[in-house]
Amino acid sequence: GWFADYLVNKELVEIYQGKAHIYRDSIMLTTSPGIDHDIVEAEKLMVEGEVEQALEMLNRLSENNPDLRQQAFINYTLAEAYKLKGEIDKQIYRLALTAIADLKFGTREYASLQKLAYLLYDKGDVDRAYKYLTCSMDDAVACNARLRFSEVTEFFPIVDKAYKLKEEKGRTIRYGLLFFASF
């Protein structure tokens, strides 16, 4: 699953996706029925193309007042399901809920806030994307999460440049208004 996302070689991608499938099945066989089991089952359904069924299961789980850690996993998995359906606004909403839970839980090695930043940047919200990526980068450094730091630093220069251009444009407009106001 997740490791395969970082591979280029198609054969290796298939090998690691196969291993993820085996591990997912093993988890389902060894965990007791409950929320954690159902989250893994929903992930399996998504991989098998049964996104609607996964959404129904995850939304039902979300309504049962799970603890904060479980709620974070449910919302993150819901965000992934909405991504598969192309429902970006719902994906953003669920990533925001996940990021809030991560922050409340004290998690510093997370993916939700940076994924949220990418989506907000794509929607033109450069300010929030910049703030969220900066926070993600600071947390990745603080907890020595090399992979998360690497992920953030791949995209940060793009957002940083857009943010600085926006700030410069704002300064230019303010100076122009001050100049014309002085006459």
Predicted regions located by residue number:
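A "functional boundary" signal
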Residues: 1-172
